[in-house]
Regions:
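Detector for glycine-centered tight turns/loop "hinges" at secondary-structure junctions
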Residues: 59, 68-69, 84-86, 142, ...
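C-terminal, low-complexity/hydrophilic appendages and adjacent surface loops
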Residues: 89-92, 100
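Short, surface-exposed beta-strand/loop micro-motifs that present aromatic residues
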Residues: 93-97, 124
Length: 189
């Protein structure tokens, strides 16, 4: 009788969880994706998010927009996220350091003039499995920050994050970015 939808925890709810009647409508959980002629995702719309994606001439994602935020992708080594709300992620830049094609460190900082301490304390080291997936992420001291296990097709099976930080680290299965709004991985293909 009840209709449920799951999107790996990205906010699709059953009516009565939000104070509604308890009678669920199948169309309430609808998400619409739109692709361009190059088969690139250009928009995703549901009850919680309306997200637009823009790509550069090289075919790689250059911008992601929602009603409250914007993410700029300068290259695989640097992204910048702005948020008009009171989110802890607003004004956050991520610098990625690679060894060959393998991401080994992400350094996070906020604002236009980050302090040395902020850059030092907000660096996260990736310990990857045979697919390149982040299975263990450690902090600047080498302590476990996040542990992730996956099903064979990339769904997060177990995720344990230390309660000492609030950083959203999107690089997960096969070292690709997990899009928070859709629950899809961006492979850049």
């Amino acid at each position: 009788e009840n209709v449920y939808s799951t999107d790996y925890g990205w906010g699709l709810f059953k009516d009565d969880e939000k104070g509604g009647s308890g009678k669920a409508s199948a169309t309430k959980y609808k998400r619409t994706y739109t692709w361009n002629e190059s088969n690139q995702l250009v928009s995703s719309v549901d009850d919680n998010y309306s997200t637009a994606y823009i790509y550069g001439q090289d075919g790689q994602r250059s911008n992601k927009y929602t009603a409250n935020s914007e993410t700029l992708y300068f290259n695989k080594m640097w992204t910048h996220h702005t948020d008009s709300g009171n989110s802890v992620y607003g004004g956050q830049s991520a610098k990625n350091i690679y060894l060959g094609e393998t991401r080994i460190v992400t350094k996070l900082n906020s604002g236009t003039n980050p302090t040395y301490q902020e850059e030092y304390y907000k660096q996260y080291y990736y310990h990857s499995d045979h697919l390149g997936s982040a299975s263990l992420i450690s902090d600047y001291k080498g302590d476990e920050y996040q542990r992730i296990e996956y099903t064979p097709y990339g769904e997060t099976w177990v995720e344990k994050t230390s309660n000492t930080g609030l950083e959203w680290l999107p690089y997960k299965f096969t070292a690709k970015e997990l899009d928070e709004e859709t629950g899809l991985y961006y492979y850049g293909a």
